[in-house]
């Protein structure tokens, strides 16, 4: 059983690495090469005033755009190609952890019945507010970030051959780092699924869902999103909402929580290659998700209570 789970997890891990690698490799290479052409400097100059609000240089717009339109790995691939400070990388990591892969993950939310404006407002709002706060509150992190396996930059390449070679090196090391994280993660997740430990975890989560203002039947949806993520866990989550009879209110609250904090293992570990502290990143996501969900649930409950009172009041008068 264990061997079968490991084998299946390895296959899924390799397939995932290949799928994501097809994005991160060309993106890393292309973005690196574009730095030595007039294209990237022109884009940077155009939007750098806006990025300054978030405490970022103009170059940082590239990973933000790629991360939100494609996926987190594309955003990280772009970061690996740019010289940024530790503070800038951390701000980007927080922004991308809240808002990434918008097309696919928003599509999942829509299938479950959550309104489009809710998802976009929460994700883009959290990314923007968190970046502004970190920029204002954190005065350190001014040193240049060192990216995991990627060696410190010694000199700027002066020929196109050297530029392409260094770009290929950055892209290849990025894929290696990706494989070292994704493959073991998929093996572990497969073992957890096959041994039904995710089901056990779902039962443990019941008190948590109540504390967040949701019914117990939302727990499997939360577990799938927290462990596998919105994109990979889409099938499980959509099925869980249908089979467990989750109401639209609870589904919306669950997704408000999950857009702030989902795939907690994978979406945290993949930032390791960027050389930033990942524990604060996880705590920011988790605390924000809990606080936001409780606030929205409380406001929603009060609105429902007031709505129930109105007909009675109107009838008695």
PLM segments and residue spans:
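Interfacial loop-to-transmembrane junctions
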Residues: 112-125, 279-286
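Membrane-water interface at transmembrane helix exits
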Residues: 27, 31-35, 80-83, 109, ...
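Selected transmembrane alpha-helices and immediately adjacent juxtamembrane segments
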Residues: 1-50, 124-133, 137-204, 208-209, ...
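Membrane-helix cytosolic exit motif
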Residues: 287-305
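Mid-bilayer segments of alpha-helical transmembrane spans in multi-pass integral membrane proteins
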Residues: 95-107, 120, 124, 128-137, ...
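Extracellular/periplasmic helix-loop-helix junctions in multi-pass membrane proteins
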Residues: 269-283
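Hydrophobic alpha-helical transmembrane segments
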Residues: 32-42, 61-75, 118-129, 166, ...
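Alpha-helical membrane segments and immediately flanking helix-loop junctions
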Residues: 57-112, 211-271
């Amino acid at each position: 059983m264990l061997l079968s789970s490991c084998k299946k997890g390895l296959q899924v891990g390799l397939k995932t690495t290949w799928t994501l690698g097809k994005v991160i490799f060309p993106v890393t290479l292309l973005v690196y090469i574009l730095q030595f052409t007039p294209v990237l400097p022109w884009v940077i100059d155009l939007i750098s005033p806006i990025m300054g609000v978030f405490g970022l240089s103009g170059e940082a717009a590239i990973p933000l755009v790629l991360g939100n339109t494609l996926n987190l790995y594309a955003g990280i691939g772009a970061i690996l190609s740019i010289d940024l400070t530790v503070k800038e990388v951390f701000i980007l990591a927080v922004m991308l952890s809240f808002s990434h892969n918008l097309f696919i993950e928003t599509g999942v939310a829509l299938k479950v019945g959550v309104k489009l404006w809710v998802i976009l407002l929460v994700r883009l709002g959290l990314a923007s507010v968190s970046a502004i706060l970190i920029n204002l509150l954190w005065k350190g992190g001014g040193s240049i970030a060192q990216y995991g396996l990627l060696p410190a930059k010694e000199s700027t390449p002066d020929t196109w051959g050297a530029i392409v070679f260094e770009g290929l090196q950055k892209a290849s090391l990025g894929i290696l780092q990706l494989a070292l994280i994704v493959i073991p993660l998929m093996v572990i997740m497969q073992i957890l699924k096959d041994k039904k430990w995710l089901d056990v975890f779902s039962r443990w989560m019941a008190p948590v869902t109540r504390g967040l203002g949701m019914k117990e039947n939302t727990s499997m949806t939360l577990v799938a999103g927290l462990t596998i993520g919105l994109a990979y866990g889409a099938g499980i989550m959509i099925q869980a909402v249908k089979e467990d009879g989750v109401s639209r209110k609870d589904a919306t609250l669950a997704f408000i929580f999950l857009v702030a904090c989902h795939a907690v293992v994978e979406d945290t570990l993949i930032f390791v290659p960027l050389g930033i502290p990942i524990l604060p990143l996880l705590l920011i996501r988790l605390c924000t998700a809990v606080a936001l969900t409780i606030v929205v649930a409380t406001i929603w409950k009060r609105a429902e209570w007031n709505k129930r009172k109105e007909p009675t009041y109107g009838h008695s008068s």
